[in-house]
Amino acid sequence: VLLRSIVNRHTSRIEQTHGLCIHYDKLEMNGLNEIYLQGLSVIPEQRDTLFTLASTRIKLNFWKLLTKKIEVSYIAAEDIRLTFTKQDSIANYDFLFKKDRKVPSQTSGQTVTEINYSERINKLLNLCYGFLPENGQLKQIYITERKDSNFVSMVFPSFIIKENKFRSTIEIHEDTLTRHWKADGELKQSANTLMAKLYSADSTKVSIPYITRRFGAKVTFDTLSYSMTKESNGKNQLYLNGKAKVNGLDIFHKVLSPEVIHLDRGHLGYQMNISDHSFELDSTTTVIFNKIQVHPYLRAEKKKDLWHFTAAVDKSWFPADELFSSLPKGLFNNLESIKTSGELAYHFLLDIDFAQLDSLKLESELKERNFEIVEYGDTQLSKMSGEFVYTAYENGMPVRTFPVGPSWEHFTPLDSISPILQMSVMQSEDGAFYYHHGFLPDALREALIYDLQVKRFARGGSTITMQLVKNVFLNKNKNFARKLEE
């Protein structure tokens, strides 16, 4: 009776706040640490059923209960159904994006407490780890998303947890397509550790559902693994470290590239530090894509509702060919198959303080040592040394192709153009053309400051060199890949 009274009080508050109807057929406590629940349903007002649960039996850690902490040691559940439906503009989950019906009023004498990120995330992770049992079995889990006549369904016939290790098969149904995945891993409450691996049950790649219909994108991979360990020093400082690996990754979206982007091997070994008002990706973090390895540093700090972002990468001397042979296929078409020798080093810094945008720092420096292009790849980068063919585009469509050189009747050599006209073009487009190496970091910095101030892309910082490269070598598709190549 006491258990039902406590549960009813909490569910009643949730019902009033979010406009839900929460019902159960049976709720009882067996002994001091076992709960049995039957016939649970959650139905938003005037909407389709969101969640149903046939039955579940949960065993709690008795000694943790004495310290007012919840830790699940065993769980058994059957027929769990989570269904997201949307018909036209009406969805059974839109309550998640609405303001609560009852908002506690604040008196003028009250002060607003700032969000403590480390404390909030620590509480959330402790809650999640507490609900992850050491042993259990979940049968027939259905997660479905349905919009009009389209749907995606994930079915877990059986999710088994034994001595902290779990495994499951997953059936994916998307409209007329069916796929089969496997998942396994390990979770340890005592060590605050989670490890998981996802891969296909057959020889095909794992294809992420829903995103093709929703975003026009396609993502596939061979295997994906992830691990995370939580540590805390109890002084508003939280540490998350772990690894993420992906093999055989293919990504397609027209905004990224007109071709499929392929990555053979990607690895992230991360160390994240979270304080009461900041997030930091430590410089000990390692990112590996194919053969190249970098150690990025990221920091986001909030002060008086304004953010301060810092990003930095310092890569000491390394063989130049490691970079060019590691570039993902489909992202740098003009550099594919290029062969180089020598060494490169790179430094990058971006520091944006939204409280003082004029203090923005942008540094990017690529150093070379005995660098040479041994063999051109798919694109002859030296073609401007002689006559070449150019295609003019308008609104993404080719309108005219002609040679740039003496064979074209309208070709005019540079020494035949008035020096005054030459100087006028340079001063209006790129006054330091003869004094830089293709980039003007200060121009890019000033353009970025202005764009952030007006909150739109209003000014560019391209030099004549960058515009020349864009027009001669790059395609006319306005996407992320073209900007990276430029």
Name each region found by the language model.
Residues V72, I121-P133, V152-F159, E163, ...:
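Juxtamembrane regions of bacterial inner-membrane/periplasmic proteins
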